[in-house]
Curated annotation (Swiss-Prot):
It is a multi-pass membrane protein. GO terms for molecular function: identical protein binding. It holds the Pfam family BRI3. Keywords: Cytoplasm, Lysosome, Membrane, Nucleus, Transmembrane, Transmembrane helix. Participates in tumor necrosis factor-alpha (TNF)-induced cell death. May be a target of Wnt/beta-catenin signaling in the liver. It comes from the Eukaryota. It is found in: Lysosome membrane. The chain crosses the membrane at residues 67-86, 92-112. Belongs to the BRI3 family. InterPro entries: BRI3. The lineage of its organism: Eukaryota, Metazoa, Chordata, Craniata, Vertebrata. This is Membrane protein BRI3. GO terms for cellular component: azurophil granule membrane; nucleus; perinuclear region of cytoplasm; plasma membrane.
Length: 125
């Protein structure tokens, strides 16, 4: 292996004189962003001791709502066995009032219907 130094000479020093511009960025001052003005001085206390201690109150309130795990809810499904689908059935009284009070009896018939599960036989009003 050859142990020669990679650079024979030292690189030239970086000296950018005023008035000399880098031609890659354009002439000096053209399109340059002016320097920001210095920030204003900070006000100092004369005594050096703070006159009061500010009180800081941190009040945090967070409402956490927990939802049950995702489950499939069947519309019209039986809440007892969770297998059957509820069917509507009319009561005897509802059918009787529908016949006796013919035009208005249908309101009674639909108001007095029951829901029944064909799987487990549970009835709901």
């Amino acid at each position: 292996m050859d142990h020669k130094p990679l650079l024979q000479e030292r690189p030239p020093a970086y000296n950018l004189e005023a008035g000399q511009g880098d031609y890659a960025c354009g002439p000096h001052g053209y399109g340059a962003i002016p320097a920001a003005p210095p920030p204003p001085p900070y006000p100092y206390l004369v005594t050096g001791i703070p006159t009061h201690h500010p009180r800081v109150y941190n009040i945090h309130s967070r409402t956490v709502t927990r939802y049950p795990a995702n489950s499939i809810v069947v519309v019209g499904g039986c809440p007892v066995c969770r297998v059957g689908v509820l069917e509507d059935c009319f009561t005897f009284l509802g059918i009787f009032l529908a016949i006796i009070l013919f035009p208005f009896g249908f309101i009674c018939c639909f108001a007095l219907r029951k829901r029944r599960c064909p799987n487990c036989g549970a009835t709901f009003a």
